[in-house]
């Protein structure tokens, strides 16, 4: 039988494979295509930051260097100047730690959730306005769900909104009705701490 040497123990055919073999490197370098995808994603993230409203941008956790780059991009008005500055924003973002990038992503996702809720609420108000203008019975239901509403005020606004529409006047009371409905929903939410149900027309 051939004696086992150090080299033979390391060979693929050894009875004890890997006895002296080095640990495989699990942290393999990223491919060029993966790097390109990562760069594109960070560039898009930077564009989202640049487009944020000022108050929301102030609430996003980010390093000072990135905040400065974003603010400079927002101040830049020329197309070419903004393009170059946004490239710089992307460069700064590529230097961030993974946890910093994730914190930014989490903040942006939170804003998207808030925006969806705000949009849904606006649609709810518009739906109530549509029902109230179309059917007097809808007011009874609205008052039942929002008992704190000033009945006479809302009724007068509805009548005025209908009249101005018939006469082709500017939609002053149409807008006032929106605000009255919004105020009633806000009051209910403050009292109950829950989102009001979406109204559906009675069968």
From Swiss-Prot:
Its subcellular locations are: Cytoplasm
Q: Which GO terms describe its molecular function?
A: ribosome binding; rRNA binding
Q: Which InterPro entries match?
A: DarP (IPR006839), DarP_sf (IPR023153)
The family database entries (Gene3D superfamilies) matched by this protein are listed as:
PSPTO4464-like domains
Basic and acidic residues: compositionally biased ranges: 27-39
Quote the biased-composition stretches of kind Polar residues, using this chain's numbering: 1-13
Q: Which UniProt keywords apply?
A: Cytoplasm, Ribosome biogenesis, RNA-binding, rRNA-binding
Give a yes or no for keyword Disulfide bond in this entry: no
GO cellular component terms, A-Z: cytosol
The leader peptide range reads none
- Tree of life domain: Bacteria
Entry function: Member of a network of 50S ribosomal subunit biogenesis factors which assembles along the 30S-50S interface, preventing incorrect 23S rRNA structures from forming. Promotes peptidyl transferase center (PTC) maturation.
The record's listing under PANTHER family reads:
UPF0307 PROTEIN YJGA
The name on file for this protein is Dual-action ribosomal maturation protein DarP
Native source species = Cupriavidus pinatubonensis (strain JMP 134 / LMG 1197) (Cupriavidus necator (strain JMP 134))
Q: Which gene encodes it?
A: darP
């Amino acid at each position: 039988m051939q004696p086992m040497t150090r080299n033979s123990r390391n060979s693929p055919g050894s009875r004890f494979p890997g006895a002296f073999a080095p640990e495989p490197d699990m942290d393999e370098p990223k491919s060029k295509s993966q790097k390109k995808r990562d760069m594109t994603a960070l560039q898009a993230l930077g564009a989202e930051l640049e487009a944020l409203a000022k108050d929301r941008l102030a609430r996003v956790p980010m390093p000072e260097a990135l905040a400065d780059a974003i603010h400079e991009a927002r101040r830049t008005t020329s197309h070419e100047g903004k393009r170059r500055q946004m490239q710089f924003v992307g460069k700064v973002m590529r230097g961030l730690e993974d946890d910093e990038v994730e914190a930014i992503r989490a903040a942006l996702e939170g804003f998207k959730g808030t925006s969806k809720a705000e949009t849904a609420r606006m649609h709810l108000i518009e739906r109530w306005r549509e029902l109230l203008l179309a059917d007097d019975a809808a007011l009874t239901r609205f008052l039942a769900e929002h008992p704190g509403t000033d009945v006479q005020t809302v009724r007068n606004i509805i009548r005025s909104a209908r009249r101005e529409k018939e006469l082709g006047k500017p939609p002053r009371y149409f807008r006032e009705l929106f605000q009255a409905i919004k105020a009633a929903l806000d009051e209910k939410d403050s009292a109950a701490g829950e989102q009001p149900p979406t109204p559906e027309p009675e069968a």
